[in-house]
Amino acid sequence: MAGFGLPNFGQLTEAFRKAQQIQQNAQKLQEELDAMEIEGSSPDGRASIWLSGNQQPLRVRIEPSLLAEGQDASETAILAALQSAYEHSTTTMKEQMEELTGGLNLNLPGMSE
């Protein structure tokens, strides 16, 4: 049936094999990302937030000296730490996905720059 523009059986089998391998690797990657702890800190280092590689919040640390400066300073530092952690985890996730897919351009939602 190659005359109808269909791939031959060998090509189809190889495509399925590759898809299964990617699926297995994706499951492993999911577990690795879940186990990661990625830290983001405020510029002065007095607020830190840790996210998993899948961007799940894990913990927060705020130095007492920051809290003593009041609500506005604390909120600003916490937001900066969260943004830093999110940026690091997004970069890590993107790099891991690119490694998993072997550089295939899959245009995954939320993973483009």
From Swiss-Prot:
Subcellular location: Cytoplasm, Nucleoid
Role of this protein: Binds to DNA and alters its conformation. May be involved in regulation of gene expression, nucleoid organization and DNA protection.
A Gene Ontology cellular-component term: bacterial nucleoid
Keywords: Cytoplasm, DNA-binding
One of the record's GO molecular function terms: DNA binding
Protein name stated in the entry: Nucleoid-associated protein PMT_0025
UniProt family annotation: Belongs to the YbaB/EbfC family.
Quaternary assembly: Homodimer.
Broad class of the protein's primary localization: cytoplasm
Family annotation (SUPFAM superfamilies): YbaB-like
